[in-house]
Amino acid sequence: MRESVINVLFYLFDDILTEQDGQEADLNQMAHWLSEAGFAHEDVGRAMDWFCELGKIGDYQPIIQTNPAVRIFSPQEAYFIDEEGQDFLRGLCRAGVLDTQLQETVIERAIALEEPLSLETLHWVVMMVIMNTGASETVWERKWSQIWLVDDDDHSVMQ
């Protein structure tokens, strides 16, 4: 059965990693579990590559912006992140949830999924990036709660 890489990653984070209960998971074992769950070998490989790249974020150091700039999305980026998603990311930057470094990481991870993203999936990518910055749990929990405070009319982060 052919699934998207996004579905494989959802399964990985929701079912496999939550069962690990804080234990470090072996990548080969995770790939094996995903294959046993019925995901295609190619999709499992791409999902594991995405997961490994996410882990390289490491110890993130926030950037203090003195002159905020507006991010213009390239045509390739706009293919994967539609206008609604772009507005969402701009709102997160305005609210201080993302700085330019984190925004670029989110965009890079979104494009790496190689398919246009729904707003819900973009929320998930943002959460995964923030959780992997090495920030304290309190910091990412606060940011995570801000991510979901979205006005349905214009998709800007409410303050």
From Swiss-Prot:
Top-level taxon: Bacteria
Signal peptide (from-to): none
InterPro entries in the cross-refs: Smg
Family: Belongs to the Smg family.
Listed name of the protein: Protein Smg homolog
Annotated organism of origin: Dichelobacter nodosus (strain VCS1703A)
Gene, per the UniProt record: smg
